[in-house]
Amino acid sequence: MSEPKLSTSSLGSIVSSAHLADGALPALSELEFGLNMISHAYQRWMIRCMAAAGVPDLSALDVLVLHHVVHRQRPKTIADLCLVLDVEDTHLVTYAAKKLQSLGLVAAGRRGKEKTLAATEAGRKACGRYREVREALLTPTVAATGISPEKLSEVAAVLRALSGHYDQAARAAASL
């Protein structure tokens, strides 16, 4: 006698907490589970990709800070980095900046009274190698899914919009 095959429709939604899915918008719990999975996978990817690019021992935030400092080849302040990366705890970005400085990937400067960070040649080269590894390992597999670049951009826009809703809900929860 063979066992009946299970399908996702017979099992229900894929969530991490059924008690959260038992509400007005169960799909939100599915989304949150997916966000948790992709968040952790993306952080692992950044760390491993940068290590493969020749710069081991960086955290995911270190990698993000380095990429943003290299972005558009303009010096950035800690406040700029915190705003763009949506990091509330300034000390985390400050620590990442010091670590990247000690590795020679960024250099400190000044804009008026504010400290700035600019990419060094070593930092730009590390980001270039990261891009090469990304193009070799990640880009082809994502392209092979058949998801169009337009659809990926659409998903990115939805995620950015949802981040605003989560931020507003966090502010409301903090005032309770």
Ranges and model annotations:
Residues 1-56:
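N-terminal leader segment of winged-helix/HTH proteins
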Residues 98-153:
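Charged, amphipathic alpha-helical coiled-coil/dimerization segments
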Residues 42, 129-145, 158, 162-170:
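Alpha-helical linker/hinge and terminal dimerization helices associated
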Residues 92-93:
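Helix-turn-helix DNA-binding helix
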Residues 47-88:
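N-terminal helix-turn-helix DNA-binding core of bacterial DNA-binding proteins
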Residues 34, 45, 64-67, 125:
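Pre-recognition alpha-helix immediately N-terminal to the DNA-recognition helix
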Residues 1-24, 148-176:
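C-terminal regulatory/oligomerization modules of transcriptional regulators
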Residues 66, 81, 96-103:
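Basic amphipathic alpha-helical segments that dock to polyanions
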